[in-house]
Amino acid sequence: MKATRKITYTAVLLALLIVLQWATKSLGQFVTGSCVNCVLAVAALVVGWQGGLTVAVVSPFVAFLLSIGPKNIAVVPAIAVGNAVLVLVLWLLLNRRFSVLRAVLGVVCAAGAKFLILYLLVVQVLCRVLTLPEKQAAMFGTMFSWPQLVTALIGT
């Protein structure tokens, strides 16, 4: 794929991801998260790891700036890292020969890796390091645990 086309596809996927986050914000984490992960998977498989990483890392920051993402800036880099891990694992496992086994393995590994990264970074590190109100820490503990695995599995 030519560089101009890759850049265009990356920009369109980033815009699509932002619009989907805005449009599904009121529908809850399972719908929004699944949509986000779906766009990330498409980005990884269509434009490759570079474009996928761009969408994965830039989108949480743009969502925060537009007030459609998390309200706490401290979790935004963790989300970017989780998204990046999902993209990289999918790309590494699926960019070569395609098979059903490889696809299932790629989805499960990518979803599991994203869940693990977000759980460790947000729940185990940020919630302990930051002085968060108890209610917000509990909310992060719920949001960034098993629902991340479910939305990653659904979306990818």
Provide a role label for each language-model segment.
Residues 1-156:
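Loop-helix junctions at membrane interfaces
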